[in-house]
Amino acid sequence: MTQKPRMAQASDGRFAPNIQLQHVKTGGFYRVVCLANIEADLAPAYVYESLQTHDFWIRPQAEMEDGRFVVVAKTN
């Protein structure tokens, strides 16, 4: 019997839901929605929203946490 893979939990990531981030290179502001899993390989990834355009984006956890984003505010 194959075990179900462990799914990403919010506590697994550096950035919790609703934290506001700034992209270092572009200066854009974003809000973290959740930590999810990419369907193809179940790798953890962040779902986040642009605070300027309200577009939603998905980025692998490793990229999101490599220094290209910094925390600017913690909201509820």
Protein language model features and the residues they cover:
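A short beta-strand micro-motif
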Residues: 19-24
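Short solvent-exposed strand/turn elements
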Residues: 39-59
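An N-terminal domain-cap segment
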Residues: 15-16, 27-29
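Mixed-charge, Lys/Arg-rich low-complexity intrinsically disordered regions
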Residues: 1-17
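Short beta-strand-centered aromatic/proline hotspots
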Residues: 28-37
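Basic, alpha-helical terminal appendages of large translation-related enzymes
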Residues: 2-6, 45-46, 57, 73
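A short, compositionally biased
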Residues: 14-18, 41-44
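Intrinsically disordered, low-complexity, charged/polar segments
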Residues: 55-76
